[in-house]
Amino acid sequence: MTKRWFITGTDTDVGKTVASCALLQAATAQGYRTAGYKPVASGSQMTADGLRNSDALALQANSSQRLGYSQVNPFTFLEATSPHIASESEGRAIPLTALSQGLRQLEPSADWILIEGAGGWFTPLSPQATFADWVQQEQLPVIMVVGVKLGCINHALLTAQAIQHAGLTLAGWVANEVTPAGRRQAEYQATLTRMITAPLLGIIPYLSDIEENPVTTRRDLGHYLDLTVLRAAEREAVNM
């Protein structure tokens, strides 16, 4: 049976894609046939191959399965703004059924699929629906990425509470150090570990060379994470 995980963040720019690539690398190293799925992406560039989003390209590059770009990212928008605004501006609706259809198309070729959201948990996809609605519809276990910085504790606890109130499994969380280590960073992480009931999968350190060595090409991220706790969360979900 295909394992499916949804990656959300406590905010925009907290490192969801870095964490997603690390998870894909770790799962691939354990022998899984992996596929990254970024169903909706805004903030893209026009290339010779068409509109391309850097986050989606990173997921494509870190998937063990050979996937076409449109399989990884069926909804690509040019402007870097909330998907529901980009959707209205470009006149392209984002039906939840289409997101599910794209996911189903990946399942035959992969046994470990990582789905990366856009922005935070309640990011709107239309005036009526949010990403959270789709995740709840699909009953996906969730991995939360926390960008460790001032304010992250409140954002993380609110996001974790919303996920659990939706009746979904918060399978784990990743601490991503988005800035160089500050005076209180270790205390932020200790507080998060104590107050978030889900297990910590690992800490990704601040990557000072991310511009010169982007996640599209680097293969040194998977060792920061421990997937054994995900297997435990999966067993717990089955037994519920």
Curated annotation (Swiss-Prot):
Q: One biological-process term from Gene Ontology?
A: biotin biosynthetic process
Give the pathway annotation. Cofactor biosynthesis; biotin biosynthesis; biotin from 7,8-diaminononanoate: step 1/2
Q: What GO cellular component is one of the record's annotations?
A: cytosol
Where in the sequence is the active site?
38
Enzyme Commission number(s) of this protein: 6.3.3.3
Provide the top EC class.
ligase
- Cite the InterPro entries for this sequence: DTB_synth_BioD, P-loop_NTPase
Q: Which reaction does it catalyse?
A: (7R,8S)-7,8-diammoniononanoate + CO2 + ATP = (4R,5S)-dethiobiotin + ADP + phosphate + 3 H(+)
Predominant location: cytoplasm
- What keywords were assigned to this record? ATP-binding, Biotin biosynthesis, Cytoplasm, Ligase, Magnesium, Metal-binding, Nucleotide-binding
For the ligand (Mg(2+)), the binding residues are: 17, 55, 116
**Quick one: which residues bind ATP?**
13-18, 55, 116-119, 176-177, 205-207, 212
Q: What is its subcellular localisation? A: Cytoplasm
Task: Specify which residues bind substrate according to the UniProt entry for this protein.
Answer: 42
GO MF terms here are: ATP binding; dethiobiotin synthase activity; magnesium ion binding
Cofactor(s) needed by this chain: Mg(2+)
HAMAP family in the record, alphabetically?
BioD
Describe the family membership recorded for this protein in Swiss-Prot or TrEMBL: Belongs to the dethiobiotin synthetase family.
* Record's subunit section: Homodimer.
Give the protein's biological function: Catalyzes a mechanistically unusual reaction, the ATP-dependent insertion of CO2 between the N7 and N8 nitrogen atoms of 7,8-diaminopelargonic acid (DAPA, also called 7,8-diammoniononanoate) to form a ureido ring.
Specify the protein name: ATP-dependent dethiobiotin synthetase BioD 1
Give the organism the record lists.
Yersinia pestis
Q: Which gene encodes it?
A: bioD1
